[in-house]
Structure formats: C-alpha cells, structure tokens
C-alpha cells in the first residue's frame, strides 16, 4: 500500500515539475522506441548516466536491476554506470545538493523515474532535441517544447562528430531507457502478452467447438425438457 502511495506521489511530482504546454500547438516527433531492443537500452543507460544523472535521479531504479534486465555484467555496470563508489543494490540518486540546484537552476531537477509515464516518449524525444540558441537566457538556450526551461542543453557535446541521424538515435536510446525505467515489468509484460493472447485464442476455439457439441444435442432434440 505504501509503495502504491509513493508511486502516485512521485508521478504527481513529476507532472508538477514541468511547465504546462499547449499540446495542440506543438508537434511532437515520434520517438519510435522499442523496449525489446536491448542494445538501445544499454546505450541509453550509458548516455543517461553520463549526461543526465549529474542533475536527475531515477530513484525507483537500482543498479543491479539494470544489470539483470539489460544483460550487463557487474564489471560493465561498475565501469559505465557507477562513478562514485555506489553499491549495486543502491537506488540511483544524484550527487547534486538541493541547495546548489536551487541556486543554479532555480529549483531541484525532478526525479525522472516516471517521466515517460507522465509525459510520454514522444515528449521526451522532442524535448531533448528541441533546444535552440537564445542569448536572453542564462544558459544561452531555450526549448521549443518547454519554453523558458531552466535546463541547459546537456547533449550539445554529444552532437560533435555525429550526423543528425546518429544523434537522433542516441536521443531515442535515452528515451527508450527512460521508458524502461518507468515500468521495468514491461520487458516481461509485452512478451508475455503475446503468449496470453495466443492461449486465449486457442481457448476460444476449443470453447466454441465444445459449445457446438453441446448445443447440437439440444438442437436435434436429444435433450428435451420433461412435460
């Protein structure tokens, strides 16, 4: 019960952490993520930890859960995802102090555990690619999705030496990873769902044939009510 309450509160906090935008006036690019693409999730995890985790936590996720779900060895997790002596069973937090965040950004950067469930993958994908130069802002950039965002364009260095398509794929991988973080069980649920539907399909056929067999006797008078 407490876990459900915490999840709902975190989801509400994520929603309130972002400014409201007019969806009708904004075109969101399709992320086209695939949570079954393990290579994409692995790259997304690496990029998130290198470019995003300095400010944003994903407190509902643990390092060893990522290792288990994404088929990563403990050594790879330690090398690419853990930078401050964290333990595998710890949740993924940020080292940024709240006081510093409030001073530098005007508020504490939100935990992104549930951002994909709150905003959707298309929103994340478009937002991360939506920064443009604006000299009137503190960080020299603005964002077409979230106007007056207090976040700098942290992925600008990721563009260096890459084509637009390659950069878009990196952003897609980060988005894919955040989609996984929002609901890790989706990895099992989506694959299991296919088998459940197949089972229900076979069960429907067998039930229909059984119904025909029973009602055949009724139809041809083998079963008749007594007078």
Segments the model singles out, each with a brief description of its role:
Residues 23-46, 57-68, 77, 182-190:
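Electrostatic cytochrome c docking/interface patches
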Residues 189-192, 201-227:
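Juxtamembrane interface at the cytosolic side of transmembrane helices
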Residues 71-144, 149-167, 227:
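Electron-transfer interface patches adjacent to heme c in soluble/periplasmic c-type cytochromes
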Residues 1-11:
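Bacterial N-terminal signal peptides that target proteins for export
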Residues 17-19:
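N-terminal signal peptide c-region/cleavage motif recognized by signal peptidases
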Residues 39, 43, 47, 119, ...:
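Extracytoplasmic/secreted proteins, especially bacterial periplasmic and envelope-associated proteins
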Residues 160-196:
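Short, aromatic-rich amphipathic segments at membrane interfaces
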Residues 48-59, 174:
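The canonical Cys-X-X-Cys-His
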């Amino acid at each position: 019960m407490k876990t459900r309450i915490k999840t709902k509160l975190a989801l509400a906090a994520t929603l309130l952490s972002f400014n409201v935008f007019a969806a009708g006036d904004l075109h969101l690019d399709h992320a086209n993520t695939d949570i079954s693409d393990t290579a994409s999730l692995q790259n997304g995890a690496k990029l998130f930890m290198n470019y995003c985790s300095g400010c944003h936590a994903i407190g509902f996720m643990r390092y060893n859960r990522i290792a288990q779900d994404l088929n990563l060895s403990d050594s790879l997790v330690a090398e690419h995802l853990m930078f401050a002596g964290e333990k595998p069973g710890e949740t993924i937090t940020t080292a940024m102090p709240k006081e510093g965040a409030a001073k530098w950004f005007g508020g504490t950067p939100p935990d992104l555990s549930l951002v994909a469930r709150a905003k959707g993958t298309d929103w994340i994908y478009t937002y991360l690619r939506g920064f443009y130069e604006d000299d009137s802002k503190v960080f020299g950039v603005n964002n077409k999705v979230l106007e007056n965002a207090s976040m700098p364009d942290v992925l600008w260095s990721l563009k260096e030496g890459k084509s637009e398509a390659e950069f878009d794929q990196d952003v897609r991988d980060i988005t894919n990873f955040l989609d996984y973080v929002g609901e890790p069980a989706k990895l099992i649920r989506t694959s299991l769902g296919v088998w459940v539907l197949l089972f229900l399909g076979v069960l429907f056929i067998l039930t229909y044939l059984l119904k025909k067999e029973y009602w055949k006797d009724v139809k041809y008078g083998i079963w008749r009510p007594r007078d």
